[in-house]
Amino acid sequence: MVIVFCGVLFMAETASILCPDKKVLLPDIHAGCPMADMITAEGLRQKKIEHPGATVVCYINSSAEVKAESDVCCTSANAANIVEKLPEGRKILFVPDQYLGHYTSTRTGREMILWPGFCPTHTRIKSRDIIRLKQEHPQAKVVVHPECRPEVIALADEVLSTGGIRRFASSTTATEVIVGTEIGMLHRLRKENPDKSFIPVSEQAVCPRMKLITLENVLWSLEEMEPEVKVPEEIRLRAKAAVDKMLEVG
């Protein structure tokens, strides 16, 4: 069986980690994640030496090598639940997204050491734009992704993962929703909820790496059966342990 991943590299790697018997293709091998590139396995190993005994909580938006150096993975949806279930008093090192880590720390009341990574796309979402849009659309609800800066999160009615934003868009009684996440998400929201108006906080919130995946290179990838993403077995097993721990705990 073949999996063609229309996303970025860490997503294809995660598919390879979980499904080693399947051929995983990424139509453009240059479709990486800038945030995932802000941390290396060697850098994380050094940080672990600086903080002995710390539990490493790794956002799923990271490379296979970084996952392999971590104790447990998390998503934006379950990060708080994962952290809450760690033993009280345990030192926590959260990588690589400082803003998801900050939001998770605020929600759980747990102090954490935060790796200084971030999503460039979500940092283009500014609080001043939300303030302006709320003035223009006073009845609108504001929903943002937890990869946004704290001052943006403070202005939101809801802070949700991508899946959570979809569910909120369907369930809310509001007819206007101001959305703070990657702008491609709005296409799906509008398609699924044609009776509602979805307003992007910023037209600049575009992930250029994701946009490298096109219908043309998906077709090419299927025809040529490449480029294949295959995580080396030694790394795969260690990374899978962190993912399995997330599924067990979260």
Describe each region flagged by the PLM.
Residues 1-160, 164-179, 186-187, 191-194, ...:
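Active-site loop-to-helix "anion-binding N-cap" substructures in soluble metabolic enzymes
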